[in-house]
Amino acid sequence: MVMGLHLLFLVFILGLGLTPPTLAQNDLRYNRFLEEHYDPKTKNGNDRYCDKMMRLRNMISPCKAINTFIHGKKESIKAICGTENGVPYNGNKRKSKSAFQVTICKHRGGSPRPPCQYRATAGSRNVVVACENGLPVHLDESIFRP
């Protein structure tokens, strides 16, 4: 029994070593995308929301000039990378078929060092993302829907 567990553990460890690095890197880039741009708890952020979220997400050293938070379901955002909720756009990017509630946080200017202050613009927009292996890894832009 003990020998069987050791063998099973060895096979597991070897399997981890054989995991393609690109898959792990894609997960890392996708998780970074979520950290920078995903907030399902808010619908429309204001200036205080931007100040707080940019600080909580560690985007203030130096102050990031602009950042967009998407307020939607994670599955709907991932679906932009497929045909369910995305269409090809401007080369290798994907544009969402449906609009998302977003909050765009723009640095008010001044010093690039904290404390950073942001102005919020909230609304419904289509988003454009770059995808790798079916996952969004970069938010390129948001497009206002007339």
UniProtKB/Swiss-Prot annotation:
Residues annotated to bind tRNA: C105, V127
SUPFAM superfamilies on file: RNase A-like (SSF54076)
Motif position, Nucleolar localization signal: 55-59
Regulation: Has weak tRNA ribonuclease activity by itself due to partial autoinhibition by its C-terminus, which folds into a short alpha-helix that partially occludes the substrate-binding site. In absence of stress, the ribonuclease activity is inhibited by RNH1 in the cytoplasm. In response to stress, dissociates from RNH1 in the cytoplasm and associates with cytoplasmic ribosomes with vacant A-sites: ribosomes directly activate the tRNA ribonuclease activity of ANG by refolding the C-terminal alpha-helix. In response to stress, the angiogenic activity of ANG is inhibited by RNH1 in the nucleus.
Signal sequence residues: 1-24
Cited Gene3D superfamilies: Ribonuclease A-like domain
Keyword Nucleus in annotation: yes
InterPro entries, alphabetized: RNaseA (IPR001427), RNaseA-like_dom_sf (IPR036816), RNaseA_AS (IPR023411), RNaseA_domain (IPR023412)
Role according to the record: Secreted ribonuclease that can either promote or restrict cell proliferation of target cells, depending on the context. Endocytosed in target cells via its receptor PLXNB2 and translocates to the cytoplasm or nucleus. Under stress conditions, localizes to the cytoplasm and promotes the assembly of stress granules (SGs): specifically cleaves a subset of tRNAs within anticodon loops to produce tRNA-derived stress-induced fragments (tiRNAs), resulting in translation repression and inhibition of cell proliferation. tiRNas also prevent formation of apoptosome, thereby promoting cell survival.
Subunit structure: Homodimer. Interacts with RNH1; inhibiting ANG ribonuclease activity. Interacts with PCNA.
Similarity comment: family membership: Belongs to the pancreatic ribonuclease family.
Protein name, per record: Angiogenin
